[in-house]
């Protein structure tokens, strides 16, 4: 039996938060006023306002944007000129029916126009004097019913009004505009009038209605509320988003606006009064071990649609699964598919049917765990990266430094800072150079969730470098410390750490330019200084001690001739086992077709380094390559590799095949076609003689990637040595890289699977990149099947 996890009704079941709505009978729109108590101030003719108790409207307050004041005019018989046209203010409201006008002595009065109007707000103009203006909006959900069980959802809107501006006695009649009138009105007998418009939009409905309001000028105090106008009501669809604007015409200020998401059937206590809610399916969610069941309890004849999608905070939803179904159904999901933003939409397959949505996994711990397991960091360029995840994540990221040896990655905060991360948004690193020891840490709720060393694939494995932190103070003062697992050690220092012992040498390396600057700003800098040469010096002393010991041992053996042959035999076996443990040397040559292919080559080289192989590739020797030149660098590497009994790996790509064909036809390639780091181009001058003179077998091996190049596209001259396709022929490829006389290891298949797993993310990123396809894919002679589309 499935263990009940939680039960959710999308339509027919009660929700913990349900609304019991007031019912309105009849199809006509209506409006009424809710005035405040307005009384004159005796002889001074000043104004005061006393607020009456609010009517029982149960209106939810709405925070308004900046209001637009309504233009008001003066009317009456107090001897002053009445300004018509300009003395009116408009507010866009959906008001229906024919309202009633209350006498001025009672305070605020209102009337609703009989028909909708066109909403033409116009530009903002200065107010000529005191005006009635809307100050804020309130909304309430009600039901408009034709019968007891035939109702529609409706939105009641209340607009609160106040007097804005100041009453000034005009010096002449031009201040109020227009020609003189025969009758001049006094301010105490005048009235402020306004025309208020409500604009309502809810796809596919849009309405605009006009409301006339009026209040005696002698009964109001400027800046105080004069009451509110309530409009019944705007019909809207269940679950829709509505927008309401309120402004005056002419406009004197910005309009009020409000956006509201209406509930669907499961949020209403009166769903049985709304016909569109009757046909919705009943959905239960339950768990059974590692599976989650969506149980839809509907009749056998009913047709409905079911859709699963990722709800995005920014941007449209991402559909995951959609199907039209009939009758009762049980949909099974694996628990690994659950993420917090996974939502379910269900609807009957009928015209204009209500679609109900629910996101039941927002608070599920397993869903949050799956979300972080699915999240990935992607390096786009040297300084840009993004976080790829199904849902939005509250996260922050920082750079950290990871030293070899398994020590924790140390955050570089300070001098750098934590940055907020947005999913699928490109972020920039404040770096000058990349380094394989630099990693990215992503935290959420102060807990480490994700850590990746993004530069490891392109720049090689971790290096035994030390990171120096330079801090700059006033008056050009600066201090240096070395980042170590125990903390940042000041240089120079008398501490017993490795960086402290080599502090003077590190400072000399920094001054001589042997350290790589990774980051720089006004407050400090980060430097990566190599430690290889100091390790070599230490090992040189160890080897010297070993040689002295071997010499002494040889002398003893000579003195004991009977045992000399046995000792020599054991010594020979030790030397051979040491060479085998050290691994065979492999020189990897490739054509730098594009940056994506270089990252793919870097991933292959890094994976081979995990085996008993010593891999040399120009990606990891850019400094020596620039100093020596590509021709000299390749000749030195080739000579050293072949002298040690190693192997040269020719990694063929469309660009490499084109270069080889060019050399075979012309004997030389055009200058300037590639950059100074193209070791493959430089190697052709001595690789071709090895093949032409038959010296290549046993010393050279060819390889190409399955979906990028077919082996038949490799020139026939180079097929005199084995050419393997990767990763499909990885076991044979690794077997060819072993020592010639080394026995075939039973772990060869296991190592091939290890290399394949390490290589797969780089292959996926190259053949299925985020956004746009990677350049150079499937271009060139002999591109294999599917090379263009990555299938």
From Swiss-Prot:
Ranges facing Cytoplasmic side: 560-791
Q: Which residues form the signal peptide?
A: 1-20
Query: In Gene Ontology terms, what is a biological process of this protein?
Result: defense response to fungus
Transmembrane: is it a keyword of this entry?
A: yes
In the bilayer, the protein is annotated as: Single-pass type I membrane protein
Q: Does the keyword Signal apply?
A: yes
Entry protein name: Interleukin-17 receptor C
Query: Which chain regions cross the lipid bilayer?
Result: 539-559
Disulfide bond sites: 265-277, 341-391, 343-359, 400-409, 439-453, 481-488, 515-529
What ranges does the Extracellular topological domain annotation cover? 21-538
Where are the compositionally biased (Gly residues) regions? 777-791
Residues with an annotated glycan are 189, 257, 284, 297, 324, 334, 420, 443, 477
Cellular component, GO annotation: cell surface; plasma membrane
Q: What does this protein do?
A: Receptor for IL17A and IL17F, major effector cytokines of innate and adaptive immune system involved in antimicrobial host defense and maintenance of tissue integrity. Receptor for IL17A and IL17F, major effector cytokines of innate and adaptive immune system involved in antimicrobial host defense and maintenance of tissue integrity. Receptor for IL17A and IL17F homodimers as part of a heterodimeric complex with IL17RA. Receptor for the heterodimer formed by IL17A and IL17B as part of a heterodimeric complex with IL17RA.
Q: What is this protein's tissue specificity according to the annotation?
A: Expressed in prostate, skeletal muscle, kidney and placenta (at protein level). Expressed in brain, cartilage, colon, heart, intestine, kidney, liver, lung, muscle, placenta, and prostate. Also detected in thyroid, trachea and adrenal gland. Low expression in thymus and leukocytes.
Q: Name one Pfam family in it.
A: IL17_R_N
Keyword vocabulary terms for this entry: Cell membrane, Disulfide bond, Glycoprotein, Inflammatory response, Membrane, Receptor, Signal, Transmembrane, Transmembrane helix
**This protein's encoding gene:** IL17RC
Quaternary structure per UniProt?
A: Homodimer; disulfide-linked. Heterodimer with IL17RA. Heterodimerization with IL17RA is independent of the cytoplasmic tail. Associates with non-glycosylated IL17RA constitutively. Binding of IL17A and IL17F induces association with glycosylated IL17RA. Forms complexes with 2:1 binding stoichiometry: two receptor chains for one interleukin molecule. IL17A homodimer preferentially drives the formation of IL17RA-IL17RC heterodimeric receptor complex, whereas IL17F homodimer forms predominantly complexes with IL17RC homodimer.
Cellular localisation = Cell membrane
- One GO molecular-function annotation for this sequence? signaling receptor binding
According to the entry, every stretch annotated as the SEFIR domain falls at: 583-735
- Which residue stretches belong to region Disordered? 762-791
